């Protein structure tokens, strides 16, 4: 059995007396739908120590922490796979949700003026991008929006472009909707940095007639924050061939210090005219379970086409608490998010330092997201193992539940993805397990080399 981490109380363990009093909704100072300037909460200074508090998420129906056995993993596995954080969300968000739950009515809701002002203010403030409120369509998530775009803009059998390795739902939403995937490989240079092969992309467009590209910006899992110059070069190719770009920018807020996300549609009005931008606070504020995403489409025809497809699903009003949380995050979450980005940068550096002790495993350079892409090819070679055996080592030897690189498509073999958005104690425990497992398996391989046996026990 592996050692369990000792949890501390999380900020969610609030007593009723800690809840903000429900505002008098008739009072002049109360937040109202017609008062976009009204804010839920004034954010205090952020204590970085909050990110190292160890929460206990077991027993909360957590996909990450409560589903190991159901999904065929060991019960005591340490989960660092799915992309949600082991950090409580921003206090501004918690405060707004507490206020909303004290109100006690959870009827149908729609984005109001305050929500729209928070959304447009966020993109103006954080990206210098002047988004118009009418561009936005709320959906229950970015992945559903990707699927909607595929269905709205292509016919069964037509080709959709993706760049692999990439977040695996990119391929899934194409294939489940009976379209054809054309995967253009990213190229890893001598420094381990992934680059786009524009010549290969253009050749694929010409060969397949594809008119839709799913872009991951920043890129999951390889950690690239595409530069403005790289995106401008991509824009030139896609515009020349009439390709609509569906930009998954869910990790945009998580560019690490020293890097900045450029929204693809912000390049120019011409770029925006053939772009569907998929955004959400779910990664940056840990709100995935509240199911709210904002899909920004400046072109009126594209927007109508997308909304028509959304209407066929029967979806109309968004999650009430999702709207509340998103508005609060975008109104008052800046300082907390900046502190989180610093914490993630430190976590990344800490993991990279610890990997120096582990022969045969190294992290690809990471510019954004809280996901590290680990190259385990050296370890596999030393241990005499095949890429398909890597996940078995992680689960049964290290007691770690990571994401096997093969699920991200071509180029993922021999890699694994680890989520570093967790307390330092969790990272230390994970790297200790990894170091011990690599040492054990490698030593076993050396011992058995003369016997013609494989390193993993039968």
Predicted ranges, named:
Residues 2, 383-385, 389, 393-402, ...:
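PLP-dependent enzyme catalytic core of the Aspartate aminotransferase-like
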Residues 111, 274-368:
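PLP-dependent aminotransferase class I/II
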Residues 338-341, 349-383, 404-411, 445-457:
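Conserved small-domain helix->loop->beta segment predominantly found in fold-type I
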Residues 106-236, 253-270, 276, 445-457:
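Conserved core of the PLP fold type I
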Residues 177, 208, 240-241, 271, ...:
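Helix C-cap/helix->beta junction micro-motif
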Residues 46-141, 148, 332, 441:
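N-terminal small-domain helix-loop-helix segment of the aminotransferase-like
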């Amino acid at each position: 059995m592996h050692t369990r981490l000792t949890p501390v109380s999380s900020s969610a363990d609030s007593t009723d007396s800690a809840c903000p009093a429900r505002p008098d909704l008739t009072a002049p100072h109360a937040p109202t739908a017609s008062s976009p300037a009204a804010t839920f909460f004034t954010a205090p200074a952020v204590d970085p120590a909050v990110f190292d508090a160890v929460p206990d998420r077991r027993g909360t129906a957590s996909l990450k922490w409560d589903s190991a056995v159901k999904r065929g993993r060991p019960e005591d596995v340490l989960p660092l796979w799915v992309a949600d954080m082991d950090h409580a969300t921003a206090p501004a968000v918690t405060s707004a949700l507490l206020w909303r739950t004290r109100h006690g009515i959870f009827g149908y809701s729609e984005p109001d003026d305050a929500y729209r002002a928070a959304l447009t203010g966020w993109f103006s403030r954080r990206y210098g991008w002047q988004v118009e409120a009418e561009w936005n369509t709320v959906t229950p998530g970015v992945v559903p929006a990707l699927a909607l775009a595929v269905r709205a803009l292509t016919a069964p059998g037509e080709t959709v472009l993706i760049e692999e390795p990439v977040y695996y739902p990119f391929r899934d939403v194409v294939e489940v909707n009976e379209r054809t995937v054309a995967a253009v490989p990213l190229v890893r240079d001598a420094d381990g940095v992934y680059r786009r092969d524009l010549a290969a992309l253009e050749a694929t467009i010409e060969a397949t007639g594809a008119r839709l590209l799913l872009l991951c910006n920043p890129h999951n899992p390889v950690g690239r924050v595409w530069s403005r110059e790289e995106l401008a070069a991509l824009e030139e190719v896609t515009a020349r061939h009439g390709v609509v770009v569906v930009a998954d920018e869910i990790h945009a807020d998580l560019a690490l210090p020293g890097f900045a996300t450029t929204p693809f549609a912000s390049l120019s009005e011409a770029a925006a005219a053939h772009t569907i931008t998929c955004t959400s606070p779910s990664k940056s504020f840990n709100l995935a379970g509240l199911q709210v995403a904002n899909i920004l489409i400046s072109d009126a025809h594209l927007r109508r086409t997308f909304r028509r497809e959304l209407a066929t699903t029967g979806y109309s009003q968004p999650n009430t608490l999702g709207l509340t949380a998103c508005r609060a995050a975008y109104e008052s979450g800046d300082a907390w998010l900046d502190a989180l980005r610093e914490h993630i940068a430190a976590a990344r550096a800490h993991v990279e330092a610890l990997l120096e002790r582990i022969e045969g495993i190294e992290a690809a350079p990471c510019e954004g997201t809280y996901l590290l892409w680990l190259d385990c090819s050296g370890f596999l070679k030393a241990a005499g193992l095949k890429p398909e055996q890597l996940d078995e080592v992680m689960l049964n030897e290290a007691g770690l539940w990571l994401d096997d690189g093969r699920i991200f498509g071509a180029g993922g073999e021999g890699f694994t993805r680890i989520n570093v958005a967790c307390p330092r104690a969790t990272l230390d425990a994970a790297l200790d397990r990894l170091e011990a497992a690599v040492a054990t398996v490698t030593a076993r391989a050396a011992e058995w080399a003369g016997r013609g046996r494989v390193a993993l026990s039968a």
